[in-house]
């Protein structure tokens, strides 16, 4: 009976386990890694486009030119754009735009993930690298934005040219402790 009174008080049942939990969270923040990212919307585009005029192709027609298969797209002005037929392991260009306050964190060679939700409830992913960063902003919808061009390999036959999806660019990594300390320092 002596021990049951000793271990049933408030401090041993609530305060000590809570203090241990807070201590474990603090120690864990030294090791837990957080990824710094920039998010935007992107579009899948072909890496090469051949423009033709006065050619009699139909929309979606497959044409063989230069030893490669191309798919025809009829432009609004009546011209024809030939784009490479998309197949697994082929490269595509992902074009995205980022606001001027986030462009300074993006560098060439950083990894990028392009996510497209599909009708069946799944999400298709493409991973690639940043290839080009615009040197001067473009004014779109009364906002200055920079164009970012990256390349990715197609790993799914359901990815098509012109698909729009979410782009996440990984700009760095830091521990949660460093992240929280930076937030506290910036607020002062």
Curated annotation (Swiss-Prot):
UniProt keywords, alphabetically: Cell membrane, Membrane, Plasmid, Transmembrane, Transmembrane helix
Superkingdom of the source species: Bacteria
Compartmental location: Cell membrane
Cell membrane listed as a keyword: yes
Entry GO CC: plasma membrane
TM region positions: 13-33
Protein name per the record: Uncharacterized protein in laf 5'region
Lineage: Bacteria, Bacillati, Bacillota, Bacilli, Lactobacillales
